[in-house]
A protein has these predicted regions:
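Short helix-loop-helix/strand-helix junction enriched in hydrophobic and basic residues
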Residues: 106-114
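Short beta-strand->loop micro-motif that forms the acidic, two-metal-ion catalytic signature
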Residues: 126-129
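Catalytic core of pol beta-like nucleotidyltransferases
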Residues: 1-103, 115-121, 131-202
Length: 202
């Protein structure tokens, strides 16, 4: 049988992505916490299918069942490669943004793509913080980046551009800034510097 290796599109793909991310054994409860947008029963059925196909190993100790990726399976290298797509995407974003003038003082992916809870209809959210008050110099770059990101991922990208002072002024009025501080995936700059910018502590 051909194993199902589509990341983040099916229960099977989500399970494989989680298992490929660490050489560890996972209980159903742990997988459920890592994949909160999937039902427990759906994850249970996916594990049963993947064990039957041989791509996932099941270990039983008393009443506890744990699961791990069968890394000797011929499909395992491809699954691991798919699981690393987020890291590669962030690296490509960073390389692109480092070529801008001026560079963002902070950039981060946020929303479902940062939390690992994307669905087939999700888009990708990115915040870019400009060092100056006038962000117009970035307009062409932002449009080009949105197009490139969709080519890289097949997903539309929503880009939130804010000036440094605008972030400071809006920190108490924009809940999205707190969401980014909590769940964001930094591309340029550090999360601690962003938290300080919005008046938090880290």
């Amino acid at each position: 049988m051909t194993p199902r290796a589509e990341p983040a599109l099916t229960h099977d793909g989500d399970v494989l992505t989680a298992l490929a991310g660490a050489e560890d054994r996972f209980t159903l409860s742990r997988l459920e916490s890592l994949i909160p947008h999937r039902s427990r029963e759906g994850l249970r059925q996916a594990l049963r299918r993947l064990v039957d196909e041989g791509i996932v190993d099941r270990q039983v100790a008393g009443t506890t069942h744990t699961y791990s990726l069968n890394r000797q399976h011929l499909a395992a290298p491809s699954i691991i490669e798919l699981a690393s797509l987020q890291t590669r995407f962030v690296e490509r974003l960073r390389e692109t943004l480092q070529g801008w003038s001026p560079q963002p003082i902070f950039a981060a992916v946020f929303g479902s793509s940062a939390r690992g809870t994307m669905t087939p209809t999700s888009d990708i959210d990115l915040i870019l913080i400009h060092p100056d008050s006038d962000t117009s110099a970035w307009e062409a770059d932002v449009d080009a980046l949105a197009l490139s990101a969709q080519r890289w991922t097949g997903r539309p990208m929503n880009i939130l551009v804010m000036a440094r002072e605008e972030v400071r002024d809006a920190r108490h009025e924009e809940p999205v800034l707190q969401d980014i501080a909590r769940d964001g995936l930094p591309v340029l700059g550090t999360m601690s510097s962003f938290v300080r910018l919005i008046g938090g502590r880290r």
